[in-house]
């Protein structure tokens, strides 16, 4: 069963003025779709791998034939990352409860967490992602290059952990609206974080990868 583009669950202009509608439309319908197309092409001869949860597939790339591994890492990784990103966006939610308590425990304050997250997102050279992850019961901020995901583990991605929150810092995520002002885009992110989804991922520690095919 081939991967398909997941619905956002909200309109392209739902995150205005922080994330503009044109960027959201192109990012979702063009960029994400391209990763899906490439992932399906890479796995066309391996339907048994297409049946797996994409998150479970990238968590153990040794399942993938060596000649397809880079394509799967980049394109299934891109599919998983973008799906998590879309689910993590919403206006009007509030950080509270167990996740807020854990952030204050592990970073000292919400403000200190935000500062560390912004630094990780700002200093990621080139294309990549900033993440809040849960590893061995503790929250941490990490960043990955290209379409790597902490689920891939340290040997592949250089970092590891279970994704709670993620921000795309590829230029295509912000350039139409923010041009070279990546720090402004990162600041705007706090206005559209879906804290309810982040809390769900933290509290339930869901076993599935959280992404649709």
Curated annotation (Swiss-Prot):
Mn(2+) binds at residues 27, 82, 168, 172. SUPFAM superfamilies: Fe,Mn superoxide dismutase (SOD), C-terminal domain, Fe,Mn superoxide dismutase (SOD), N-terminal domain. Transmembrane segments: none annotated. One of its GO terms (cellular component) is cytoplasm. It is an enzyme of class 1 (oxidoreductase). The gene is sodA. One of its GO terms (molecular function) is superoxide dismutase activity. This is Superoxide dismutase [Mn]. It catalyses: 2 superoxide + 2 H(+) = H2O2 + O2. Homodimer. Keywords: Manganese, Metal-binding, Oxidoreductase. Its cofactor is Mn(2+). Destroys superoxide anion radicals which are normally produced within the cells and which are toxic to biological systems. The lineage of its organism: Bacteria, Pseudomonadati, Pseudomonadota, Gammaproteobacteria, Pasteurellales. Its EC number is 1.15.1.1. Belongs to the iron/manganese superoxide dismutase family. Binds 1 Mn(2+) ion per subunit. It comes from the Bacteria. InterPro entries: Mn/Fe_SOD (IPR001189), Mn/Fe_SOD_BS (IPR019833), Mn/Fe_SOD_C (IPR019832), Mn/Fe_SOD_N (IPR019831), Mn/Fe_SOD_N_sf (IPR036324), SOD_C_sf (IPR036314).
């Amino acid at each position: 069963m081939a991967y398909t583009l997941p619905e956002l669950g909200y309109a392209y202009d739902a995150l205005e003025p922080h994330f503009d509608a044109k960027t959201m439309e192109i990012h979702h319908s063009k960029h994400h779709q391209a990763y899906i197309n490439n992932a399906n092409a890479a796995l066309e001869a391996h339907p048994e791998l297409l049946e797996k949860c994409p998150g479970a597939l990238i968590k153990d790339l040794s399942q993938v034939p060596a000649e397809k591994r880079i394509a799967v890492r980049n394109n299934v990784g891109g599919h998983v990352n973008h799906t998590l990103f879309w689910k993590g966006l919403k206006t009007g939610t509030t950080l509270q409860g167990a996740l807020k308590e854990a952030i204050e425990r592990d970073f000292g304050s919400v403000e200190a967490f935000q500062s560390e997250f912004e630094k990780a997102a700002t200093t990621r050279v080139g294309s990549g992602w900033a993440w809040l992850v849960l590893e061995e019961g503790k929250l941490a901020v990490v960043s990955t290059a290209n379409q790597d995901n902490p689920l891939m583990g340290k040997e592949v991605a250089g970092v590891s952990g279970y994704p709670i929150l993620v921000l795309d810092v590829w230029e295509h995520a912000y350039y139409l609206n923010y041009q070279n002002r990546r720090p402004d885009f990162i600041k705007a992110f706090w206005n559209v974080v879906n804290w309810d989804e982040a809390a769900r991922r933290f509290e339930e520690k869901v076993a599935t990868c959280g992404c649709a095919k």
